[in-house]
């Protein structure tokens, strides 16, 4: 696609992981886009926040060519996952990339918070027709607690999930488990009830909070939002899994 000046749309790229096993089915080529409007307290990639700080910009065509070189490695079982940052902030680039990937028979996934979703933006229809899987990060089921945790409420995320469900788009739901913030039993039960209203959820994952991102905050001269918050115990993780998945 061309933008209004007739230039090819470029994506703001943070990094790539050529063979990742954690973001979708099989082996994945994971493309991390630059830029995010959320400020999740547990974010471990604060270096992806500022949209102007992209490591590089590249056209969808260039990135697709890079990906296609790895096609033999990820084969039929794997594919491509676009993560971030927040991929939905770069809709035109994402759609253009997925068009080329689908022409090449490659499985497409988006790892997103759903926060930028706007039901009145017609571009989503086109994107979702090219999307095989959405890995949806539900930050918090409670709108106010979500706002407190991320700076943004969860209404758009819930609307996005319903749109995916209504349009037959497969999704995985992810909940990051942070002691004292996202592990309240009643909240988790509400999350489970909400998941049960969605028709296309193939998998629910509980991601235990970790502190691997701490050094990045120091490098960026930022204070670490969660201070000394402990990582969850095995028991806390199992309890959350029992409610959300069991």
Describe the predicted segments one by one.
Residues 53-60, 150, 154, 184, ...:
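Flexible, glycine- and charge-enriched loops at secondary-structure boundaries
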Residues 9, 15-17, 21-58:
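Canonical Radical SAM [4Fe-4S] cluster-binding loop centered on the CxxxCxxC motif
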Residues 13, 37, 48-52, 164-171, ...:
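N-terminal/domain-start segments enriched in small and hydrophobic, helix-friendly residues
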Residues 50-72:
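Short hydrophobic interaction/assembly module
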Residues 47-53, 147-153, 221-229:
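Short glycine-enriched, charge-decorated loop/helix-capping segments at active-site entrances
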Residues 64, 68-72, 76-79, 84, ...:
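Conserved AdoMet/S-adenosylmethionine-binding subsite of the radical SAM
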Residues 1-22, 179-246:
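Auxiliary Fe-S-binding modules of radical SAM enzymes
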């Amino acid at each position: 696609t061309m933008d209004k000046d007739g230039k090819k749309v470029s994506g703001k790229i943070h990094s790539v992981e050529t063979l990742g096993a954690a973001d979708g089915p099989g082996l994945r080529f994971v493309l991390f886009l630059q830029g995010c409007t959320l400020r999740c307290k547990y974010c471990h990639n604060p270096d992806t926040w500022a949209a102007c700080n992209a490591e590089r910009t590249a056209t969808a065509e260039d990135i697709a060519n890079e990906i296609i070189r790895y096609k033999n490695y990820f084969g039929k079982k794997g594919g491509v996952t676009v993560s971030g940052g927040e991929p939905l902030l770069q809709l035109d680039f994402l759609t253009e990339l997925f068009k080329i990937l689908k022409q090449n028979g490659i499985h497409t996934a988006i790892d997103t918070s759903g926060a930028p979703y706007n039901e009145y933006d017609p571009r989503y229809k086109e994107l979702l027709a090219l999307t095989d899987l959405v890995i949806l990060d539900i930050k918090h089921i409670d709108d106010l607690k979500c706002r407190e945790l991320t700076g943004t409420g969860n209404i758009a995320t819930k609307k996005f999930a319903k749109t995916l469900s209504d349009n037959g788009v497969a999704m995985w739901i992810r909940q990051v488990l942070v002691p004292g913030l996202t592990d309240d039993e009643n909240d988790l039960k509400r999350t489970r009830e909400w998941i049960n209203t969605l028709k296309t959820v193939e998998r629910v994952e509980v991601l235990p909070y970790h502190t691997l991102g701490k050094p990045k905050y120091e490098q960026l001269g930022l204070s670490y939002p969660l201070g000394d918050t402990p990582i969850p115990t095995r028991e806390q993780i199992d309890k959350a899994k029992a409610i959300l998945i069991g």
